[in-house]
Amino acid sequence: MAVKKVVTHPAEVLETPAETVTVFDKKLKKLLDDMYDTMLEMDGVGLAAPQIGILKRAAVVEIGDDRGRIDLVNPEILEKSGEQTGIEGCLSFPNVYGDVTRADYVKVRAFNRQGKPFILEARGFLARAVQHEMDHLDGVLFTSKISKYYTEDELADMEG
């Protein structure tokens, strides 16, 4: 496992749709492990392959709940409902934070690292994290969805 350099905006790779993963091999497993290590090192809750310069439809998410680490390969949203607005940040946009409105519930079909399909149903913060990472796979920047920006001082004031 290795910590990789996170690509920061502006970078073309962040705005380019990623390619479908077709081979589930040791290289993919290493990519997912490197992404996970990088996410933890950077104190994130999710990371998509394009954020480390790899245009593959792969992401990892871990929000600190009992589900633990979730590898998402070739994810697609099957259903979504409800609405939530909350503050988001992104490892590819250091010190940029803002309100983003997303679905409160998503049902996602994806593949695990072995190529086995699974269904993930997520609500609240996990749904937010999954949608954020899936946007990266489509070349969509979270800044295109921000309705209100916050400074670090404003965030610190909110946290008390």
From Swiss-Prot:
Pfam family, one: Pep_deformylase
Superkingdom of this protein's organism: Bacteria
Catalyzed chemical reaction(s): N-terminal N-formyl-L-methionyl-[peptide] + H2O = N-terminal L-methionyl-[peptide] + formate
Cofactor(s) essential for the protein: Fe(2+)
GO biological process, one term: translation
UniProt: Fe cation binding residues: C90, H132, H136
Cofactor comment text: Binds 1 Fe(2+) ion.
InterPro entries for the chain: Peptide_deformylase (IPR023635), Peptide_deformylase_sf (IPR036821)
Its job: Removes the formyl group from the N-terminal Met of newly synthesized proteins. Requires at least a dipeptide for an efficient rate of reaction. N-terminal L-methionine is a prerequisite for activity but the enzyme has broad specificity at other positions.
NCBIfam families: pept_deformyl (TIGR00079), PRK00150.1-3 (NF001159)
Family, per entry: Belongs to the polypeptide deformylase family.
PANTHER family named in the record: PEPTIDE DEFORMYLASE
Name recorded for this polypeptide: Peptide deformylase 1
Organism, as annotated: Bacillus subtilis (strain 168)
Gene from which the chain derives: defA
